[in-house]
Amino acid sequence: MAATKLDGKLYRDEIFADLEQRVAALKEKGVTPGLATVLVGDDPASHSYVRMKHKDCEQIGVNSIRKDLPADVSQEELNAVIDELNADDACTGYIVQLPLPKHLDENAVLERIDPDKDADGLHPVNLGKLVLNEPAPLPCTPNGAIHLLRRFDVELNGAKVVVIGRGVTVGRPIGLMLTRRSENSTVTLCHTGTKDLAAETKAADVIVAAAGVPHMITADMVKPGAAILDVGVSRGEDGKLKGDVHPDVWDVAGAVSPNPGGVGPLTRAFLVRNVVERAEKLLRA
């Protein structure tokens, strides 16, 4: 029997409807949230992601600001754009689209962002608050992934969750979020260097695949009935974008998020929600 499709688009629209009302209420009080994006280079996938984010803003009523920079931009020029957004009151929050070209220092860029304007929840201060379980903007993809599991009634309390990937955007933060008391999962963090990965995944109730290795999770690595989140994106040998989960997994798993269309729509929804929540916080202050 085919697995249940964990369709993020269903619940993205639910979140957007709530955000539209909240943005309208802010505008009645003279406040219009603004989301900015900083995009470096000509990667088609990154351009597509950014375009969708600005389309989301238009739908919800959030102002959007685009900063598109050439692939050969210098660190100093990129720093100047970040400083400009930090000082711009029209920009409630912003993201720097990752990954950046290799000549740029990604960590230095993330550290330069004003932590209060960090819409992606990836500033070291905000990741540190996540470790300490203090309020801060949460990383959008892990937040979307957990929301998707909850909305489809996937049990997290006491569940054995295997996370594959150690990146700052998904792998590391989702492990922290899943071990909060509100989720209460037992997490094993694996990666491309893990020995006998299949032994880990076969024992998992939930698998979060975020390594960026095409079709690395196959049916023989999955416990029947397990829930699988396909978060990784990479290009196969044919040049096409692929997820980390092989299509044959759908015949074994109980639930699978498609890629695209699973976690991605909720990532975008929580990005905008982080910006709207900051606008509400500023108004209360």
Curated annotation (Swiss-Prot):
It catalyses: (6R)-5,10-methylene-5,6,7,8-tetrahydrofolate + NADP(+) = (6R)-5,10-methenyltetrahydrofolate + NADPH; (6R)-5,10-methenyltetrahydrofolate + H2O = (6R)-10-formyltetrahydrofolate + H(+). CDD domains: NAD_bind_m-THF_DH_Cyclohyd. This is Bifunctional protein FolD. GO terms for molecular function: methenyltetrahydrofolate cyclohydrolase activity; methylenetetrahydrofolate dehydrogenase (NADP+) activity. The lineage of its organism: Bacteria, Bacillati, Actinomycetota, Actinomycetes, Mycobacteriales. Keywords: Amino-acid biosynthesis, Histidine biosynthesis, Hydrolase, Methionine biosynthesis, Multifunctional enzyme, NADP, One-carbon metabolism, Oxidoreductase, Purine biosynthesis. GO terms for biological process: L-histidine biosynthetic process; methionine biosynthetic process; purine nucleotide biosynthetic process; tetrahydrofolate interconversion. Pathway: One-carbon metabolism; tetrahydrofolate interconversion.
